[in-house]
A protein has these predicted regions:
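Intracellular juxtamembrane helix-capping segments at the cytosolic ends
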Residues: 116-129, 311-325
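Helix-breaking motifs and short loop linkers at transmembrane-helix boundaries and internal kinks
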Residues: 43, 75, 96-101, 130, ...
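A late C-terminal transmembrane helix in Major Facilitator Superfamily
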Residues: 327-362, 369
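Helix-to-loop junctions at the C-terminal end of transmembrane segments
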Residues: 63-75, 258-271
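Conserved MFS/SLC helix-loop-helix module at the cytosolic interface between two early adjacent transmembrane helices
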Residues: 62-100
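Cytoplasmic helix-loop-helix junction between adjacent transmembrane helices
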Residues: 106-142
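Helix-loop-helix hairpin linking two adjacent transmembrane segments in secondary transporters
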Residues: 131-132, 138-187
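Extracytoplasmic gate region of multi-pass secondary transporters
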Residues: 31-32, 207-249, 253-259
């Protein structure tokens, strides 16, 4: 049997998952509520301001694609350390911003740091918490979204007493706490070169990988659009920066609850499609409300969007890991999905900015995301776990020969289904 090297001290690793998750979104969510002040001082305009969200998402995508190769060379510990240093440096650069270029550069550094984290942690979670992947991925997603809520609600309030750039820079401090915990308490495996087992197909060549990429991209395009433009949309309606920040916070809090709750509800069965369907319905209702009646029930629309986005993000991360039994291969699939998915998602804020430029309002941005959700609702129907082994080209006997139990998805193939793969 192949000995599986797992991180020792799963409790310490879980604390690290929480600390890192909290730090992955404030650098994005803090910008929207301050958009008016930033534009007034730096003169960015809507199109350039979109790059503060667009560029990090793009770099997260590129960085996550490179992470599996970096893991083979360096291992998870140096990569997570480098990720936290990049996040801390990116936030610290905002201490005394004097140009839009520097603001965009700081966002780029934070995006690269987030990329290394999101390409590394899913595989570690799959290996260290094999029986509790939905729970731990839910915790990770919830912390990420909870951190986003804190960024949106606290930053504009701190900016009342400090310069807005200094308020943004304060988010370097909680990153330092995560870095200290990583160095003090967490033990992780060393690098171990890895290649696909003989006969296993390259993940990038599989249609299923691209289906997951499309779903992930649509989900995170919606997140990018609301993070970038929800607060500015309500600022344009006469709301204050603090009120706009509260809306983003409501959205992020709903993301947090749903990001943890839906994976737990879905954990009883390997077929996560009913719960993903619920998440899509909530998003359709929320984005539809923002489009048709933005001032009728803004908090409700934000709660629906947040719950749908948070639940679908956590579920698609779990679904990707469900497809393969081996933690490293599952982590590579997750990295591939996130990499190309974030590149796709990066177009969302830019398209929304262009549509706003052409139409003069934000309704077209919400319509754009609704179109993506219609497409995603069709793609999700194909995520039948009974077909995971077949669509991934896995061989049950090959997995058993390596000392790995056949995954539930493979065992389930004894019962055939008429649902398309």
């Amino acid at each position: 049997m192949v000995k599986r090297h797992l991180p020792s001290g799963s409790g310490a690793l879980l604390v690290l998952v929480v600390l890192i998750g909290i730090n992955l979104r404030p650098f994005l969510t803090a910008i929207g509520p301050l958009a008016g002040q930033i534009d007034a001082q730096l003169g960015l305009g809507m199109d350039r301001l979109a790059w503060v969200t667009l560029l990090p998402l793009l770099l997260i995508g590129v960085g996550v694609l490179l992470t599996p190769a970096l893991l083979d060379k360096a291992g998870p510990r140096p990569l997570l350390g480098a990720a936290l240093l990049l996040l801390m440096l990116g936030s610290a650069l905002r201490l005394d911003l004097y140009s839009g270029t520097l603001l965009i550069a700081s966002a780029a550094l934070c995006g690269l740091g987030s990329a290394l984290v999101q390409g590394t942690l899913p595989g570690l979670i799959k290996g260290a918490f094999a029986g509790k992947v939905p729970l731990v991925m839910g915790i990770f997603s919830a912390c990420m979204m909870g951190g986003g809520a804190l960024g949106a609600v606290l930053t504009p309030r701190v900016a009342l007493h400090l310069d807005w750039s200094r308020a943004l820079a304060l988010w370097s401090l909680p990153v330092l706490l995560a870095l200290l915990w990583l160095g003090w308490r967490v033990r992780l495996p060393a690098a171990a070169p890895h290649s696909a087992p003989s006969g296993e197909p390259r993940l990038i060549a599989l249609p299923r990988a691209w289906l997951l990429i499309a779903c992930f991209g649509i989900i995170n395009s919606g997140y990018g659009i609301v993070v970038a433009w929800l607060a500015p949309a309500y600022l344009a309606l006469g709301w204050s920066p603090q009120q706009g920040g509260e809306l983003v916070a409501w959205l992020a809090l709903a993301q947090t609850a749903s990001g943890l709750g839906l994976p737990l509800l879905a954990a009883c069965k390997l077929d996560r499609r009913p719960w993903m369907g619920l998440a899509i319905v909530m998003q359709v209702a929320g984005f539809g409300g923002l489009w048709l009646a933005p001032e009728a029930a803004p908090i409700l629309w934000c709660l629906l969007c947040g719950a749908g986005l948070g639940g679908s993000f956590s579920l698609i991360m779990v679904i990707a890991l469900d497809h393969l039994p081996d933690p490293r291969r599952a982590g590579s699939l997750s990295a591939l999905m996130q990499g190309f998915g974030f590149i796709l998602a990066a177009t969302g804020p830019w398209v929304a900015a262009r549509l706003h430029h052409l139409s003069g309002d934000f309704a077209s941005a919400w319509q754009w995301q609704l179109g993506g959700l219609m497409l995603m609702s069709l793609l999700v129907l194909r995520l039948n776990p009974r077909h995971y082994a077949r669509v991934m080209g896995a061989r049950v006997m090959g997995a058993r020969a390596m000392g790995q139990p056949a995954p539930l998805a493979q065992r389930a193939q004894t019962v055939q289904s008429d649902t398309p793969a």
